[in-house]
UniProtKB/Swiss-Prot annotation:
PANTHER family in UniProt: ATP SYNTHASE LIPID-BINDING PROTEIN, MITOCHONDRIAL (PTHR10031), ATPASE PROTEIN 9 (PTHR10031:SF0)
Organism: Hyphomonas neptunium (strain ATCC 15444)
Molecular-function annotations in GO: lipid binding; proton-transporting ATP synthase activity, rotational mechanism
Entry-linked Gene3D superfamilies: F1F0 ATP synthase subunit C
Membrane-spanning parts: 16-36, 57-77
Places the protein is found: Cell inner membrane
Site (Reversibly protonated during proton transport): 61
Principal location class: membrane
Record protein name field: ATP synthase subunit c
Amino acid sequence: MEGNITDGLKYVGAGLATLGMIGSALGVGNIFASFLDAAMRNPSAAPQQTGNLFIGMALAEALGIFSVLIAILILFVA
């Protein structure tokens, strides 16, 4: 009986850890929406801001990748 409760709580913890991907997805969406809005207002400045776009996207995606990594660690190591 003890092992079943522990296994169940492990799955709940892994599921909660993956909720960080929601924030990552919202962040990437906001970054691209803001970039496209700015590019439509001032097309001549868009090429200069593309590097900033990809840096911001990479930082936002890193948080989602870290949350998946934590979920995998909870499932297979703990």
